[in-house]
Amino acid sequence: MADDRKAALDAALKKIEKNYGKGSIMKLGEKIDQQISTIPSGSLALDVALGIGGYPRGRIIEVYGPESSGKTTVALHAIAEVQKNGGTAAFIDAEHALDPQYAQKLGVNIDELLLSQPDTGEQGLEIADALVSSGAVDIVVIDSVAALVPRAEIDGEMGDSHVGLQARLMSQALRKLSGSINKTKTIAIFINQIREKVGVMFGNPEITPGGRALKFYATIRLEVRRAEQLKQGTDIVGNRTKIKVVKNKVAPPFKIAEVDVMYGLGISQEGELLDMAVEKDIVDKSGAWYSYKEDRIGQGRENAKIYMSNHPEMMAEVSTLVRAAYGIGEPVDVPQEAQEELPLDE
């Protein structure tokens, strides 16, 4: 009886593989490589908070938060990292608000960046689907979900009711996109805004537009919020920003990365590296002085940041030590043709 069941199962597996291709079904123990391929986020503190050293390939990421909190900055840093490693990036600018000069200062190669400014939500998501399905794009950023306006709303009159249209659009698009994103190992970053529910007396009244589908399909959800202003004398030069990993299917969630987002420059890698090195006693802080290997590198945090910026060899050395101390190592980037398809989480 057991032999008959095994023979029937073998026959069914062969038929499935014949119809849908080799690898369409297998035993989980047969997986050759379960290691998740990643790309750096552009922030060492965020790489640590993510738990795997960067963004996982073949997954959907949602980045949300209040206005001017640094959401697009976080996404542009990811694009810059992909391009540094020879990858191709696309930006679906539904808000029609991308600043090319700012993107360039963050390290984005704007000459090679694929940019689309769609007229409707359907057009934007269809373009994203075409790019992902090609298998030739490493990262697609959609900015933002709230700006993906359904065609019916564009064609309608002001004041017309369009209840649930955007939620249905997102649900339908993500059902289609999720499979091809996983198959082609493309990273899809959806930037989202926040709204407030009317009449909520208890609990958090904040919600993200676009319905619930994105919350379910996203492997990682990042909440970006400004914590405080950074001043140089009386001038405000940036914001201290908290990035909270609200959801994470590939590592423990709820970790927080604190970064300095400097106006016109993006995330200060010197600042976050200095803070993390001090936390792990790699850089010594005594009073206002910072020291590395008995050498003083600056009095005050800003001077220490300037010193590190002027000494890239030392920065690279400290970065390696910090990564080792946090146990994340360098980001893993498995060649696309050598990767096994990883199953999407339920």
Curated annotation (Swiss-Prot):
It is found in: Cytoplasm. One of its GO terms (cellular component) is cytosol. Its main location: cytoplasm. CDD domains: RecA. SMART domains: AAA. InterPro entries: AAA+_ATPase, DNA_recomb/repair_RecA, DNA_recomb/repair_RecA_CS, P-loop_NTPase, RecA-like_C, RecA-like_N, RecA_ATP-bd, RecA_C_sf. Keywords: ATP-binding, Cytoplasm, DNA damage, DNA recombination, DNA repair, DNA-binding, Nucleotide-binding, SOS response. ATP binds at residues 65-72. GO terms for biological process: DNA recombination; DNA repair; SOS response. GO terms for molecular function: ATP binding; ATP hydrolysis activity; ATP-dependent DNA damage sensor activity; damaged DNA binding; single-stranded DNA binding. Belongs to the RecA family. NCBIfam families: tigrfam_recA. Can catalyze the hydrolysis of ATP in the presence of single-stranded DNA, the ATP-dependent uptake of single-stranded DNA by duplex DNA, and the ATP-dependent hybridization of homologous single-stranded DNAs. It interacts with LexA causing its activation and leading to its autocatalytic cleavage. This is Protein RecA. The lineage of its organism: Bacteria, Bacillati, Bacillota, Bacilli, Lactobacillales.
